[in-house]
Regions:
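Long, compositionally biased, intrinsically disordered segments
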Residues: 7-222
């Protein structure tokens, strides 16, 4: 008798998408994704696993009317381990119990001027199963997106991007101060706000390049 188990993904910690305008309606789309390299599986999309298999990192670009304009895959550039927070008071007891890896992806696309602009969307399931303030986090996916404004807003634009990585762990009961600053190549003023993370796909369908349901994740108090 052969028994099969669905290859679920329980690894996503976070991510961001940003872009640079190259001229001639060409944009370099960049994405960083973070995974738990202790409690989570599988490896990053776009990179080979231990058997040489590669799951493509699909993304889709939509116009403001939800029409898919480009469906493609990111080029996997590099991945590395995020250094731990060595100056944390609980670092000696936490060392070896926390591990986060960062993957970098890029893709150059041509996007003609379009009123309203475009949305670049990447979806993947699932989030880290150790999350405490989500119901069944190991079956909750993630959606990351970036908006490229249309010509009625600006003729050419580069998006902001975060400057510092957040610490991979914080100490229970100890306040944290972290400078989550971003920079903008155009020198634009930046406004920061907190929002609900977006859900995306589930354990039954962990990866697909279709119209993404950008819905906030269901939360519970803890």
């Amino acid at each position: 008798m052969l028994l099969f188990k669905l290859a679920e993904a329980t690894h996503i910690v976070g991510g961001e998408i940003y872009y640079d305008y190259l001229g001639g309606n060409n944009y370099k789309i960049s994405m960083k994704v973070y995974r738990d390299c202790i409690n989570g599986v599988p490896p990053f999309d776009g990179f080979p696993d231990g058997f040489g298999n590669i799951i493509p990192a699909y993304f889709t670009i939509y116009d403001v009317f939800d029409n898919p304009i480009i469906s493609s895959t990111f080029n996997a550039i590099s991945f590395s381990t995020v250094p731990p927070t060595n100056n944390s008071p609980c670092a000696p007891t936490t060392a070896g119990n926390a591990c986060v890896e960062e993957a970098l992806y890029e893709k150059i696309v041509n996007l003609p001027p379009s009123v309203g602009g475009y949305y670049v969307v990447y979806q993947r399931c699932c989030r880290n199963g150790t999350i405490l303030n989500l119901i069944n986090p190991g079956s909750v996916g993630a959606s990351y997106w970036e908006h490229i404004p249309g010509p009625e807003v600006v003729s050419s634009n580069n998006s902001p991007r975060f400057t510092n990585r957040p610490p991979i762990y914080i100490c229970d009961g100890i306040p944290i101060a972290f400078n989550h600053v971003a920079s903008d190549p155009d020198g634009d003023s930046l406004v920061y706000s907190l929002c609900d993370p977006f859900n995306g796909l589930d354990a039954c369908c962990p990866i697909i390049n279709t119209n993404p349901p950008l819905l906030p994740t269901a939360q519970c108090s803890n």
